Amino acid sequence: VEPVHINYRGYDVWEMPPNGHGITALMALNILKGFDFDGRDSVATLHKQIEAMKLAFADGMQYIADPRYMRTKVEAMLSEEYAAERRALIGEQALLPEAGKPFCGGTVYLCTADNEGNMVSFIQSNYKDFGSGVVLPGYGINFNDRGAGFSLDESSDDFLLPRKKPYHTIIPGFLTKDGEAVGPFGVMGAYMQPQGHVQVLMNTIDFLLNPQAALDAPRWQWIDGREVWLEDRFAPEVIEQLRKLGHDVRV
């Protein structure tokens, strides 16, 4: 497939296209690049990151489908004009966007590189538990159950049809700058993946952390509505101030 990308502060961020949800990470970054940030774990930074991710997911859950059936085009979703429109919605209080309810997954991500400059960003998941439970006779290959990503709402671009690809969450990423490879990136966890991409990339680009530190930094995850999960490594005062901004924070 042909990956989709945006430019974020001089870096080209590459993600898997629809029917995967890598585009939600790109939409969030497109919104966030219009802000200045005062620190990695500050209340203002976390609030803006969470709100941008919520807006991106609201669009993603509405529009992502098999690209042959998408009535809203990727180019429109990633346009600077649309990012500015969505950015203007972010205020001092937590939003309540319309979006589907995320749920947990079981995914493996790995990346590798060699001394010749070859790099691989790889992810694998059968989706729920053991996937479909259907195994290829004689080979032991277990088929996935990604068909669960279809919508049964006939008005949805992601409505279930024969020979159609469902919305899915498998999105290995890649980062380049000025046409040169910087490196692969990715995280695990279904709907956490684009949220993790945004946080790891901002840790690297905005806050100048090395790759290990960018991955090790504490993370948040938007769940649904105003509910946000934060790792307990965030400062207690940051957690309390986010609650005052209207976020339903669970630690």
Predicted regions and their residues:
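Short glycine-rich loop/turn motifs
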Residues: 2-3, 25, 105-110, 119, ...
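Active-site rim segments in enzyme catalytic domains, especially the processed small/beta chain
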Residues: 118-183, 207, 211
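Long, well-ordered, tryptophan-enriched scaffold segments
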Residues: 1-13, 17-18
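Extended C-terminal subregions enriched in glycine
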Residues: 46, 116, 164, 197, ...
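Glycine-rich phosphate/pyrophosphate-binding beta-alpha loops
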Residues: 14-22, 108-111, 123-134, 187-193
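Alpha-helical support elements that line or immediately flank enzyme active sites
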Residues: 187-209
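Internal maturation/activation junctions in enzymes
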Residues: 35-126, 138-139, 146
